[in-house]
Structure formats: structure tokens, C-alpha cells
Amino acid sequence: DDIDVFMMRDDYNKMLKIAPNYFKEPYFFQSAYTDVMVWGFSKLRDSRTTAIEFDDMKEQFNQGIFIDIFPLDSTDDGSAKMKTVTNIKKDIWDCIFNREAILNNIDNPDIWKIFTLDKDMILELVNMSYKDALRVFEEFCETHLYDTDKLRCWSSEVMGRLRKHYERKWFDKIEYAQFENILVPVPADYEEVLTMEYIEWKIPVKSETLHSGIIIDPDISYKEWLKSHTKYKKNVME
């Protein structure tokens, strides 16, 4: 129901620096550094279209139809080193997304037992801005990208989808495949990637989409939709 693009973490971090100035209207590169939402991935949007996920957000928050862009990182391969690296990633992530729970339990000695990082580092991270703490996370991930050949998207890690992982060799070579009227780069070992992702990917499945709740309209801008929807809600309430 949408397009997901995966990039190695080092390429992804480069993109974060380049993309905001590279993409011009009507396209908009959206990340934690361009908007109020804090995500561990990015979106490339078409501002002429509508893909409303949050109908209570103001027009300044771009909600055009999007491509999701996810970084691939090294992950736990069973070794002691990668277990530690993965646990530190989780610690930093908690300091970004669960900081209120940490700060509310700051005097509870048991909370410090769950972290691999020491208390001083945790407190330093939770007192950073969300964006600065996210930069720490992204830089740490890039530093350890080549520590193992086992890769995983961090969003899968967070959601507990641990069955899914990728071998680095699957991405060693790329080839170009036809997608509608364009050619897109895909891993030469795309069958291995698809099997890991979907198991029986050659069998069509009719099911609800992940983004079934999104309001999609390719013909009008999300700004127009929000304006008309806001007026509608106001009239109903009156």
C-alpha cells in the first residue's frame, strides 16, 4: 500500500544532511529534524497530494503521499559484543522515546538495573533535546554498522519483529528492476530478502493494509483537505 526504501545506515545518515536542500517543491523530505514528530526513519512526500495520518495536525506538518525511508543497522548476531551494542542502542532509544518514564522513576534504584549504560550517561541523554539524543543514536548505529554481517531495520527491532533480519552479502550487488515507468535499484539477491520479509511472497494475499486508516487523495493537496475537513468538523460541532 506504499513504498518502503531501505538504505545502509551510513548512506542514510549522509542523506539526512543532503536531502533537505536537495529536494525542492512540490517534494518535501521529512525527518525528525524538519518536523515536530520524532521518528527513526524519514519520508519523501509530494505536497500536491494527500495522505492524512493525523487529522488533528496543522497544515505546517506535511501530509502528502509518501515514500518511507528506513536505515539498515547491524544487529545482535549472538556474540557478546553485538549483544552489548544492541543493548546500548535500546538504552539510547529509551532515552528518546521513554524519557518521561525514566525521569519519573529517577529515585527508583531498580530502574538503573535495566540499562547497560551507566546512570550518568542515561541522565545526560534524557536531558538532551529529542533531536540531539537522536543524533547520538544515529551516530552510534553508524559507528557499529560493520561490526557484523547480520542486519535489521531498527523499527523491526523495536516492534519485536526479530524473525526478520538480512545478510549483508544480499546487498553486495544491485541490479535494476522495472517499477511502472521507472527503473529502481534492487539487491541482486532480492529473492532472499523477499523470503525473509514475507516468507511465501510469490503467493498473492488479500488482507488489510498496514496503512488502511490513512486518507489518500492523489488529486488534492493535504492543505486543501485539512482546510475543508476542519470546516466540516466545525460545522458538525456547531
What are these regions (language model features)?
Residues D1-L16, N181:
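Catalytic metal-binding acidic patch
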Residues G78-T84:
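A short secondary-structure junction signal
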